[in-house]
Amino acid sequence: MRAIAVDIDGTITDKKRRLSLEAVKALRGAEEAGVPVIMVTGNILCFAMATSVLIGASGGVVAENGGVLHINDEVRVLGDISKAEMAYSHLKGIYPVRKVQFSDLRVSEIALTRDVPADTVREALRDFDVEVYDTGFAIHLTDPSVNKGSSLEILLESMGIEMEDVMAIGDSENDLEFIEAAGFRVAVANADPELREMADYVTSAAHGEGVAEAVRRFMGW
């Protein structure tokens, strides 16, 4: 294993978005052992960067569900937000949808509060060129040409690391692509059923404690 790619919300944080100290300790330990940690999130870049700095992660950041990358001090916007904007314009004419806090900081996608069920949103947008993800924290309207998996591959290529040499850890449906592509797939105990089914290892602990469990197990600590 040459790198660890890990989701943030619901994976290293709990339902209230509190960061797990156990996860931080384990991920810092991996970094100290020479295994770079990569943040892979649906959240905005500045949030992901702050989390990365707090942990001491050196592997770069995939943000906005693959729509934005931070590689070697360079920010790359890969997702086309105009697709989400068109879909949102249509949607708000039908349902009382609202954008999440700090939406003005998103540059590749739109994230909505979960006031309207995700399946209802998907049905309403079936003729639009967007992907709809429900993370349990927000409903994301994204450019379908990018996702966490495809953007992680770009980041890893810059690091000279193959996907098969990565342990990926996640919890929700927007993690499916990058978990599926990784060499070793980990689902925390609170993960969605589909993610648990594809995982090579499902932790006994939930959220950040599950991340710590997986890292320690496969680092041989």
From Swiss-Prot:
SUPFAM superfamilies: HAD-like. Pfam families: Hydrolase_3. GO terms for cellular component: cytosol. CDD domains: HAD_Pase. Mg(2+) binds at residues 7, 9, 171, 175. GO terms for molecular function: magnesium ion binding; phosphoglycolate phosphatase activity. It is an enzyme of class 3 (hydrolase). Its cofactor is Mg(2+). This is Phosphoglycolate phosphatase. The keyword Acyltransferase does not apply. Catalyzes the dephosphorylation of 2-phosphoglycolate. InterPro entries: HAD-like_sf, HAD-SF_hydro_IIB, HAD_sf, PGPase. Substrate binds at residue 148. It comes from Methanothermobacter thermautotrophicus (strain ATCC 29096 / DSM 1053 / JCM 10044 / NBRC 100330 / Delta H). It catalyses: 2-phosphoglycolate + H2O = glycolate + phosphate. The active site is at 7 (nucleophile). Belongs to the archaeal SPP-like hydrolase family. Keywords: Carbohydrate metabolism, Hydrolase, Magnesium, Metal-binding. Its EC number is 3.1.3.18.
